[in-house]
């Protein structure tokens, strides 16, 4: 059933792309040129997808993207990945190996996918000592958190509905967290760090709020290990996903940015070095689906 629906969506998207690709490419090129021309003076610049923007602009632009896609975010994840994102997230939480007594910060937690898996994993583990656990779901976009909280209520995964586990939802910037030093035993961020302006600051803040022995884990789109497969994946990403976003969510530009941000993100080894530079030890990564995504892990020792 899922395969049939996904195939139908892909077919519709491919037909739709022929009516939009040429004009959209022209608009993107114009936007990139005008964006570059408008940047003057000494203010630092960064990338927003393939565009060059002022650092002060990127946060607002990313915020606007997720405001636009919040209500359709989970549906689009299923459509874009043909449902495989569910498997990636399951593996991610299994690699974390939640235990009772853990204090987790789920950064860029948005609509709650990682947190809900964490809570269900805990529920399946015996807890004879009744050790209390906690998770803080944090995101820079309040709209995404609102969607997540409503999902939690429907799924029966709120503090009132759980035993020996509390859940908090808090809007926060990953680059300047409002939490005390050494306040969490684990930090997760899934498909969020590439949207941040200063990845080094995000990693530094993650290190700060973790307790000694705490674990940092990141699930993020990455780069395929085979050049031919990377080319095929790029064709799918750029030719299918934006029109699919238009068909299902009425958002071409938002999903154009998302695929561009994936291509701009550092390769696995480079990101591994960035995690090490933030102070983490025993840093490693694991490729899933030939490197479409990678799980990065490090410890604060």
From Swiss-Prot:
Family, as annotated: Belongs to the class I-like SAM-binding methyltransferase superfamily. MenG/UbiE family.
Cellular component annotations (GO), alphabetically ordered: extrinsic component of mitochondrial inner membrane; mitochondrion; ubiquinone biosynthesis complex
One Pfam family from the record: Ubie_methyltran
The entry's keywords: Membrane, Methyltransferase, Mitochondrion, Mitochondrion inner membrane, S-adenosyl-L-methionine, Transferase, Transit peptide, Ubiquinone biosynthesis
Protein source organism: Drosophila melanogaster (Fruit fly)
BP GO terms, sorted: methylation; ubiquinone biosynthetic process
Membrane topology classification: Peripheral membrane protein
Region feature (Disordered): 20-44
Boundaries of the annotated transit peptide in chain numbering: 1-16
Subcellular location: Mitochondrion inner membrane
UniProt binding sites for S-adenosyl-L-methionine: 111, 139, 173-174
E.C. numbers: 2.1.1.201
Organismal lineage: Eukaryota, Metazoa, Ecdysozoa, Arthropoda, Hexapoda
Gene coding for it: Coq5
Biological role stated in the UniProt entry: Methyltransferase required for the conversion of 2-polyprenyl-6-methoxy-1,4-benzoquinol (DDMQH2) to 2-polyprenyl-3-methyl-6-methoxy-1,4-benzoquinol (DMQH2).
GO MF term list: 2-methoxy-6-polyprenyl-1,4-benzoquinol methyltransferase activity
Enzyme class name: transferase
Keyword Repeat: no
Pathway per the UniProt entry: Cofactor biosynthesis; ubiquinone biosynthesis
Main location: mitochondrion
Catalysis: reaction(s): a 2-methoxy-6-(all-trans-polyprenyl)benzene-1,4-diol + S-adenosyl-L-methionine = a 5-methoxy-2-methyl-3-(all-trans-polyprenyl)benzene-1,4-diol + S-adenosyl-L-homocysteine + H(+)
Subunit structure: Component of a multi-subunit COQ enzyme complex.
Xref: HAMAP family: MenG_UbiE_methyltr
Chain intervals with Polar residues compositional bias: 20-31
Name listed for the protein in its UniProt record: 2-methoxy-6-polyprenyl-1,4-benzoquinol methylase, mitochondrial
SUPFAM superfamilies: S-adenosyl-L-methionine-dependent methyltransferases
């Amino acid at each position: 059933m899922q395969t049939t629906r996904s195939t139908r969506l892909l077919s519709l998207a491919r037909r739709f792309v022929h009516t939009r690709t040429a004009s959209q490419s022209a608009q993107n090129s114009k936007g990139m040129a005008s964006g570059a021309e408008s940047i003057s003076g000494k203010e630092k610049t960064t990338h927003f997808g393939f565009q060059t923007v002022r650092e002060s602009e990127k946060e607002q632009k990313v915020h606007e993207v997720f405001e636009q896609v919040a209500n359709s975010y989970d549906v689009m994840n299923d459509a874009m990945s043909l449902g495989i994102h569910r498997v990636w997230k399951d593996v991610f939480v299994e690699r974390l190996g939640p235990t009772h007594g853990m204090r987790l910060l789920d950064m860029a937690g948005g609509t709650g996918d990682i947190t809900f898996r964490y809570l269900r994993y805990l529920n399946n583990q015996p807890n004879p000592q009744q050790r209390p656990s906690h998770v803080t779901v944090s995101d820079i976009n309040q709209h995404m958190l609102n969607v997540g909280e409503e999902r939690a209520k429907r799924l029966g995964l709120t503090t009132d509905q759980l035993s020996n586990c509390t859940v908090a939802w808090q809007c926060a910037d990953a680059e300047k967290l409002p939490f005390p030093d050494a306040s969490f035993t684990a930090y997760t961020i899934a498909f969020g760090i590439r949207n941040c302006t200063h990845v080094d600051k995000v990693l530094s803040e993650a290190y700060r709020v973790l307790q000694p022995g705490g674990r940092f884990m990141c699930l993020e789109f990455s780069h395929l290990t085979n050049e031919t497969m990377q080319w095929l994946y790029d064709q799918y990403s750029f030719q299918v996903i934006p029109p699919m976003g238009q068909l299902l969510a009425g958002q071409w530009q938002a999903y154009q940015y998302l695929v561009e941000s994936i291509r701009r993100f550092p390769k696995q080894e480079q990101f591994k070095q960035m995690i090490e530079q933030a102070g983490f030890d025993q840093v490693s990564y694991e490729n899933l689906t030939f490197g479409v995504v990678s799980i990065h892990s490090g410890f604060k020792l």
